[in-house]
């Protein structure tokens, strides 16, 4: 407990892994600021945290809109005085836009998927870094810690079941962005890392959760996780990256995948995308 005592953590997203992380951060003593597009989700999460005795504030914002991102960062600083940590989670599947194999993806589907999964994280990072650069280092000597959300689909694809190329490209770009940021802001003592979960029980995974063939594959592909990761398993890793326990760690991608990336198991042949 209290591994994040006295810290201010900004979390983008308000369901799934973002919600699990926000609740765990508050439980570890952090003041938590939540921002996502859906005000009802933000409010419900904030109410749960407050009911448990946590410090919390929120602002609904379209994180692909630069002005709204800036307002969210301003609100966080006004509420809690600074930003020590960012966990940038918000994003989602591009299937509703038409994401799929590249030969089937329209320009609009590509743009919409990258807007949701890459532009959002880039804009939030820019606004938060500007704030971190303007503030004094904390007692551990760092100005802040940033954790980005990647995915094993970018590095360990399973095209038979998860053939969404725009999403994979966005998540691959997140890893590149993380590395570039870590190098750029190292002299400023801002740490930047990323996590890459495999199939996790979140609203985004509803399609998989209802498909027995996908679940059977997941049980064999990520045996340490069972069918799916629990969002709190990602949240626990996030606490490490945002706490002083990782004060010398930057530029790293951690796969949280139950064995997915080292397991050569493939789905049964003939499965349609």
Label for each model-derived stretch:
Residues 92-93, 137-173, 178-187, 199:
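Catalytic loop of short-chain dehydrogenase/reductase
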Residues 87, 186, 191, 249-251:
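Short, small/polar-rich loop/turn modules that mediate ligand/substrate recognition or access, typified
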Residues 97-114, 218:
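Substrate-binding pocket helix/loop in short-chain dehydrogenase/reductase
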Residues 125-126, 179:
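A short, exposed helix-loop element centered on a Lys and neighboring polar residues
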């Amino acid at each position: 407990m209290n591994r994040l005592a006295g810290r201010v953590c900004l979390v983008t997203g308000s369901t799934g892994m973002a919600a699990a992380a926000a609740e765990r951060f508050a439980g570890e003593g952090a003041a938590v600021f939540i921002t996502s597009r859906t005000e009802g989700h933000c409010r419900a999460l904030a109410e749960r945290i407050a009911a448990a005795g946590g410090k919390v504030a929120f602002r609904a914002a379209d994180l692909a809109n630069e002005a709204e991102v800036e307002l969210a960062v301003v609100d966080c600083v006004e509420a809690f005085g600074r930003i020590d940590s960012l966990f940038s989670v918000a994003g989602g599947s591009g299937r509703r836009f038409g994401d799929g194999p590249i030969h089937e993806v329209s320009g609009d589907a590509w743009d919409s998927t990258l807007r949701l999964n890459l532009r959002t994280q880039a804009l939030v990072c820019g606004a938060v870094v500007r704030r971190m650069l303007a503030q004094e280092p904390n007692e551990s000597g760092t100005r802040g810690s940033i954790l980005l959300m990647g995915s094993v689909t970018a590095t360990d694809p399973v095209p038979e079941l998860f053939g969404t190329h725009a999403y994979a490209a966005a998540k691959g770009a997140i890893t590149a962005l993380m590395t570039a940021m870590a190098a750029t802001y190292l002299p400023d003592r801002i740490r930047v890392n990323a996590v890459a979960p495999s199939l996790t029980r979140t609203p985004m995974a509803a399609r998989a959760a209802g498909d027995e063939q996908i679940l059977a594959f997941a049980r064999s592909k990520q045996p340490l996780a069972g069918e799916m990761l629990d969002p709190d398993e990602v949240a626990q890793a996030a606490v490490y990256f945002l706490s002083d326990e990782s004060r010398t760690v930057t530029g790293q991608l951690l796969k949280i995948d139950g064995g997915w990336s080292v397991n050569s198991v493939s789905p049964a042949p003939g499965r349609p995308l």
